[in-house]
């Protein structure tokens, strides 16, 4: 009936009628008053007096009858002046003479649409009595459920499925997805275990009194869920519960966190003082390391996580910012050990997952799974711009950015933008100096793994990319692509100043410096500047005296390869002269 947090407009001393009768009769909702109020926005709750659970229980039958008459009269007046509303659930119950029930929240907590409460549902007409303990609920806003064919109002609540147990292990109550008809269907949802079968009591064997919540351990019945909450507050102080099988601890007010269910195979919440246990159907067997609750928000003075009486508590080591597993090679940290193991394979080169059809190896099982699809499915994702096909839709999406020119990933240090996140990560290593990929042969380190792969071919002599025109082989595919332009004559890079074209973009960049006069490569010893880095390297050999190029005919050394080639031509000329 209305929101429990709203206070009546009048008060009286405990034991007296808690609102003035004159206020209801004279100032409540007569047609004249409603017509005057209709100049502004008016709702039915504006003419409704709400009671808390304690206030309602203090009313005697005559006072409850007076309240029923006044509220029904208010509703009739409200409709008579032209207000069109759905009949409130409270009015329906008053018309049928049913006993009202109210929600009750814990002290010092404001009413929230999604709040942890302890709720007691009493009998529903002639159906078997039911008592439901709800730890977390949400109000029904758009959807409506039904209980035994009767629609639930918007102020009703729905609950996760819980089972309440006594200290001797027997079932007291069973609650299905909203409100169950009987206890027996729970057997199928609990797996039909014989261990549970003997302990379950049907509603015929043990019925719960409509206005009480049984508390077997202390030997008395508590009159309301409010008394139960107060009793638990005094009997069960905030304490820390530890589970010694994995040395993990959890903190919750008077409730043992269902950590043990990961080890025992059952999901329970144990009130340690009174031995009442709530069992939850869902998520059985899930370790709480993987569970998180949105409402866990505060910490106590010891740095331990506190939670607001909810179904799940976040395990201390599953916090999003905690990364306890550190890579010994590069220092990167991870939340899970499995992530660290996969990451370490980058450094070790281990590839344990091997394709049984082609023998190709992978670091991750997911990569192997995607690869195996190439043998069965091919490349189903086709680019409409260039006709290239891909195995994965995500790869096609990234490829589209090459046509659109989109560069969504920007470096925060220098502002450079990239079309792929992996390119940005590689680029950022130029700022940090990190070189995680190391050659096992010579110890040289590289920023990119592809650069390491190409470098390793200098040790093995492997040149897998072969030109179909002349048969020349190359260790990089990009080098082969540049070489093939010699045969095709393609020069796609054109200078906007003079119109000259080039096969490589790098050569065009160097050519631009002729027009701009830029000489960015300066010698640190003499200050002479050059437009090309290769010219600077050649110049620096003058200072060092280095002459690495030797003539095989006469043994003379040169600092530049071009000078050696020019020199070798003199030997060929002399040979032709003597012939």
From Swiss-Prot:
The biased composition feature labelled Polar residues covers: 27-36
One GO cellular component term, please give it.
nucleus
Q: Is this entry keyworded Repeat?
A: yes
- Keyword tags: DNA-binding, Metal-binding, Nucleus, Repeat, Repressor, Transcription, Transcription regulation, Zinc, Zinc-finger
- SMART domains attached here? KRAB (SM00349), ZnF_C2H2 (SM00355)
**Location relative to the cell:** Nucleus
Q: Where is this region: Mediates interaction with TRIM28?
A: 12-135
Compositional bias of kind Basic residues: 1-12
Q: Where is this region: Disordered?
A: 1-37
Q: What is its main location?
A: nucleus
Q: Which Pfam families match?
A: KRAB, zf-C2H2
Keyword field contains Zinc: yes
- Report any one BP term from Gene Ontology: regulation of DNA-templated transcription
Start-end of C2H2-type zinc fingers: 241-263, 325-347, 353-375, 381-403, 409-431, 437-459, 465-487, 493-515, 521-543, 549-571
Where does the record place the KRAB domain?
42-113
Q: Please, which domain of life does this record's source organism belong to? A: Eukaryota
What's an example of a GO molecular-function annotation for this chain? Answer: DNA binding
InterPro entries from the xrefs?
A: Ikaros_C2H2-ZF (IPR050589), KRAB (IPR001909), KRAB_dom_sf (IPR036051), Znf_C2H2_sf (IPR036236), Znf_C2H2_type (IPR013087)
The UniProt annotation puts the region (Required for transcriptional repression activity) at 325-579
**Record note on quaternary structure:** Interacts with TRIM28; enhances the transcriptional repressor activity.
Q: What does the protein in this record do?
A: Functions as a sequence-specific transcriptional repressor.
Q: Which family does it belong to?
A: Belongs to the krueppel C2H2-type zinc-finger protein family.
What is the protein's given name? Zinc finger protein 382
Q: Which organism is it from?
A: Mus musculus
Lineage, highest ranks first: Eukaryota, Metazoa, Chordata, Craniata, Vertebrata
């Amino acid at each position: 009936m209305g929101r429990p947090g709203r206070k009546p407009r009048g008060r009286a001393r405990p034991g007296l009628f808690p609102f003035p009768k004159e206020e209801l009769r004279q100032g409540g909702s007569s047609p004249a008053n409603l017509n005057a109020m209709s100049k502004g926005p008016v709702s039915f709750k504006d003419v409704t007096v709400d009671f808390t659970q304690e206030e309602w229980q203090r009313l005697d039958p005559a006072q409850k009858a007076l309240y029923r008459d006044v509220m029904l009269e208010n509703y009739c007046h409200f409709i008579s002046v032209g207000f069109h509303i759905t009949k409130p659930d409270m009015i329906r119950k008053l018309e049928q003479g049913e006993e009202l029930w109210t929600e009750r929240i814990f002290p010092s907590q404001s009413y929230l649409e999604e709040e942890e409460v302890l709720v007691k549902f009493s009998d529903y007409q002639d159906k078997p009595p039911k008592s439901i303990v709800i730890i977390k609920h949400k109000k029904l806003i758009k959807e409506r459920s039904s209980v035994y064919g009767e629609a639930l109002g918007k102020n009703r609540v729905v609950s996760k499925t819980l089972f309440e147990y006594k200290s001797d292990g027997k079932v007291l109550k069973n609650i299905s997805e909203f409100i169950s008809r009987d206890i027996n269907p729970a057997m199928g949802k609990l797996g039909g275990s014989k261990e549970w079968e003997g302990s379950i009591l049907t509603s015929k064997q043990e019925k719960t009194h409509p206005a009480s919540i049984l508390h077997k351990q202390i030997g008395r019945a508590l009159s309301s869920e409010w008394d139960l909450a107060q009793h638990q507050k005094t009997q069960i102080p905030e304490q820390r519960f530890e589970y010694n099988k994995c040395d993990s601890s959890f903190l919750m007010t008077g409730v043992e966190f269902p950590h043990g269910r990961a080890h025992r195979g059952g999901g329970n919440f144990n009130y340690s003082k009174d031995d009442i246990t709530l069992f939850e159907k869902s998520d059985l067997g899930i370790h709480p390391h993987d569970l998180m609750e949105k409402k866990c928000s505060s910490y106590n003075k010891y740095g331990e996580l506190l939670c607001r009486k909810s179904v799940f508590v976040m395990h201390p080591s599953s916090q999003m910012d905690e990364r306890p597993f550190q890579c010994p090679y590069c220092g990167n940290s991870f939340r899970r050990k499995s992530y660290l193991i996969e990451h370490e394979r980058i450094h070790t080169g281990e590839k344990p997952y091997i394709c049984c059809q082609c023998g190709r190896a992978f670091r991750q099982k997911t990569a192997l799974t995607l690869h195996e699809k190439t043998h069965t499915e091919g490349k189903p994702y086709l680019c409409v711009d260039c006709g290239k096909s891909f195995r994965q839709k995500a790869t096609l999406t990234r490829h589209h950015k090459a046509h659109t020119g989109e560069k969504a990933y920007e470096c925060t240090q220098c502002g450079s933008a990239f079309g792929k996140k992996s390119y940005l990560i590689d680029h950022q290593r130029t700022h940090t100096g990190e070189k995680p990929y190391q050659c096992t042969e010579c110890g040289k380190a590289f920023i990119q793994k592809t650069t390491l792969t190409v470098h390793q071919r200098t040790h093995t002599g492997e040149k897998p990319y072969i030109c179909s025109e002349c048969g020349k082989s190359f260790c990089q595919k990009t080098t082969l692509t540049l070489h093939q332009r010699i045969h095709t004559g393609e020069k796609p890079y054109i200078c906007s100043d003079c119109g000259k074209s080039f096969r490589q973009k790098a050569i065009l960049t160097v050519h631009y410096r002729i027009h701009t006069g830029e000489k960015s490569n300066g010698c640190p010893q003499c200050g002479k500047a050059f437009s090309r880095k290769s010219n600077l390297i050649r110049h620096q050999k003058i200072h060092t005296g280095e002459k690495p190029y030797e003539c095989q005919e006469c043994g003379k050394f040169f600092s530049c390869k071009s000078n050696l080639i020019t020199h070798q031509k003199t030997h060929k000329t002399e040979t032709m002269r003597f012939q």
